[in-house]
């Protein structure tokens, strides 16, 4: 395969992210089921010999890698077209097969534990018994029946967003959910961003009843699941991310004690602009008025990739090779299309020795740093391809650190490059914007999620109750240093993030990993 032309928007192909077609996916799904049927039969009476049992372990690992890859394909297709209903059906089938696979793997694991100590300490058995090993999906059929349709409904709801707004030249343009969120995160046009924000909030207010129903259903399910297992609703999240309750409480307390210092990331940015306060859309938005474009080293795809490779060289020289491979093999899709879902992510394709990166083309300083995050995650996934399946499944709390590391290293690289230049304030804005997100917005969203779960135990919550909780969360993080007349409209925006994380199973790990990732200051 060949590298895309200079600064040409990278896009997935049928070879880079396989099975996007119905025929290809159906064939791979049949292959996965055939492997699982064989494993189920053999797991009933596992072989006693180490050689035969080792073959069975490797067979299960191959099936797990294929299952993970098929999940990634489902997400890739859904992200490419949020209105597509097929990925939800596909994902349901993959998860049902994955549940059967883990059931069969349990029988194989029991046989592995009966091997002599010296045999268990060798490959391929050692990985299955490692304290770092993570078992696959244990979701029940009831979970699949409830949660998957709710997740699909949320995707289809946001896919209907079409915001009509005048452009700079006076023509009316239509923005999808993905395009609107991109404007809010990366556009340096303050007027345009505020206009989109107002329409964005109005759209969610108009659909608030539907999203409230979704949130009530998801939160209600999580409480039911915890109660049925005889556990607190946070226990499963802590276990999945290998975080102890004591560590989580200590982290949140430390963030709370330093909240006033963290708020300086907002007040100092207001001072940079010569303003008394920041509008709510400026807290996580790009800077306006300092520079129309990104500084040298962050202009366009090629410059961003070059800077990121240089920045990561001291951490691991292999990162540059991964980035080159990702571009040459079309593992990155950064197209801007109205039907695309919002967000930026990277998932693994271990069965195909590849990764899938979904992002937007880096435009401006904020877009460049946003682009770095999924590439850091992708590098971590690719580095794990030599490991057995149980060791590839790192918890989100660990995976997120690799994304944050890539952003941090790029920030440090650009700080050295721009030191003493007229563009230094642009980077300073980026550093404080990111700190505002990590130290204020993410913890407040985590607090919001926990508060809503606690409130949901008392009954169904109204849309107004959700928005009131969102407004409290916004004021908890940044009320005083922002435009108070504007933060009252932030509730619907934060509720949007709450809806998205609710349907994807949010955990405390986002707060944890962002708080302990290396900081450039």
Where are these regions (language model features)?
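Active-site-adjacent "gating/activation" loops or surface patches in catalytic cores
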Residues: 169-186, 232-235, 288, 296-385
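Long, K/E/R/D-enriched contiguous segments that form extended
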Residues: 268, 272-310, 320, 355-356, ...
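A well-structured
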Residues: 1-291
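C-terminal substrate/ligand-recognition segments
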Residues: 499-516
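Short beta-alpha connecting loops at secondary-structure transitions
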Residues: 86, 90, 356-360, 387-396, ...
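Long, amphipathic alpha-helical stalk/connector segments used for oligomerization, subunit docking
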Residues: 413-498
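An active-site-proximal "capping" alpha-helix that borders the catalytic cofactor pocket
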Residues: 378, 398-412, 511
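Post-HEXXH active-site segment of zinc metalloproteases
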Residues: 369-370, 381-405
């Amino acid at each position: 395969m060949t590298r895309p032309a200079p600064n040409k928007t990278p896009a997935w192909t049928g070879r880079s992210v396989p099975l996007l077609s119905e025929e290809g996916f159906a064939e791979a799904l049949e292959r996965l089921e055939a492997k699982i049927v064989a494993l189920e039969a053999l797991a009933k009476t596992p072989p006693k010999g180490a050689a035969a049992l080792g073959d069975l372990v490797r067979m299960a690992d191959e099936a797990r890698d294929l299952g993970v890859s098929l999940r990634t394909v489902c997400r890739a297709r859904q992200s490419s077209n949020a209105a597509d209903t097929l990925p939800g059906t596909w994902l349901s089938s993959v998860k049902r097969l994955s549940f059967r696979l883990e059931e069969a793997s349990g029988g194989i694991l029991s046989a592995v534990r009966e091997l002599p100590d010296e045999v268990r300490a060798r490959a391929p058995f050692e990985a299955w018994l490692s304290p770092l090993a993570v078992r696959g999906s244990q979701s029940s059929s009831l979970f699949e029946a409830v949660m998957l349709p709710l997740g699909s409904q949320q995707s289809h709801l946001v896919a209907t967003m079409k915001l009509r707004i005048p452009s700079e030249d006076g023509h009316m343009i239509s923005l999808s959910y993905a395009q609107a969120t991109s404007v809010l995160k990366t556009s340096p046009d303050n007027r345009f961003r505020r206009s989109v924000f107002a329409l964005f909030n109005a759209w969610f207010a108009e659909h608030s009843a539907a999203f409230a129903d979704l949130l009530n259903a998801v939160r209600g399910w999580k409480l039911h699941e915890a109660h049925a297992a005889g556990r607190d609703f946070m226990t499963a999240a802590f276990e999945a991310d290998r975080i102890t309750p004591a560590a989580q409480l200590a982290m949140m307390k430390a963030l709370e004690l330093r909240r006033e210092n963290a708020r300086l990331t907002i007040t100092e940015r207001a001072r940079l602009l010569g303003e008394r306060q920041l509008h709510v859309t400026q807290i996580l938005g790009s800077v306006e008025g300092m520079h129309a474009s990104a500084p040298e080293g962050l202009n366009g795809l090629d410059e961003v990739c070059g800077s990121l490779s240089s920045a990561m060289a001291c951490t691991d020289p292999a990162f540059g090779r991964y980035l080159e491979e990702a571009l040459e093999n079309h593992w990155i899709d950064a197209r801007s299309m109205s039907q695309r879902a919002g967000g930026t992510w990277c998932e693994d394709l271990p069965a195909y020795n590849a990764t899938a990166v979904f992002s937007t083309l880096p435009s401006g300083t904020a877009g460049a740093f946003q682009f770095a995050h999924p590439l850091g995650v992708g590098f971590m996934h690719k580095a794990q391809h030599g490991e057995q399946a149980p060791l590839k499944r790192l918890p989100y709390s660990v995976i997120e650190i690799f994304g944050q590391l890539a952003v941090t290293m790029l920030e440090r690289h650009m700080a050295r490059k721009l030191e003493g230049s007229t563009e230094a304030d642009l980077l300073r804005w980026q550093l404080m914007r990111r700190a505002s997100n990590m130290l204020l917005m993410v913890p407040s969203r985590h607090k919001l999620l926990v508060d809503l779960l606690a409130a949901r135990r008392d009954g169904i919550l109204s849309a107004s109750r959700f928005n009131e909780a969102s407004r409290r969360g916004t004021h908890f993080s940044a009320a005083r240093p922002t435009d108070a007349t504007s933060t009252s409209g932030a509730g619907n925006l934060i509720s949007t993030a709450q809806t998205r994380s609710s349907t994807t199973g949010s955990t405390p790990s986002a707060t944890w990993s962002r708080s302990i990732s290396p900081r450039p200051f």
